[in-house]
Amino acid sequence: MEFGLSWVFLVAILKGVQCEVQLVESGGVVVQPGGSLRLSCAASGFTFDDYAMHWVRQAPGKGLEWVSLISWDGGSTYYADSVKGRFTISRDNSKNSLYLQMNSLRAEDTALYYCAKD
């Protein structure tokens, strides 16, 4: 069965390592338009709750686009206009984990998603 990009989303998962800092993203699957998806990012090698965290993405053939930011304590969140009202960023400092809940997915959300520390 073949799927076109206009019908499904494929969010590829990459593992990023820089020095001792490790950020491992997971949760990418094929999702129907209008569907939902939750991405996770497990952090290690630094004091997670000392840093604000970001999600960024890269659509095929495009540059990096900032998606969302959450403060160190989760008290403040910020979103790109393109995802506002559809995406929710959260974190669990006890688990050194960052999350991105993505609802009402659109074709233009098709991208590689990365977590990043401030």
UniProtKB/Swiss-Prot annotation:
Is the ATP-binding keyword given for this protein?
no
Q: Which gene encodes it?
A: IGHV3-43D
| Classification of source organism | Eukaryota, Metazoa, Chordata, Craniata, Vertebrata
Disulfide bond residue pairs: C41-C115
* Name of the protein this chain belongs to: Immunoglobulin heavy variable 3-43D
Record region (Complementarity-determining-2): 70-77
**Record region (Framework-3):** 78-115
Species of provenance: Homo sapiens
Q: Where is this region: Complementarity-determining-1?
A: 45-52
The record, for CDD domains, names: IgV_H
Return the annotated region ranges for Framework-2: 53-69
SUPFAM superfamilies per UniProt: Immunoglobulin
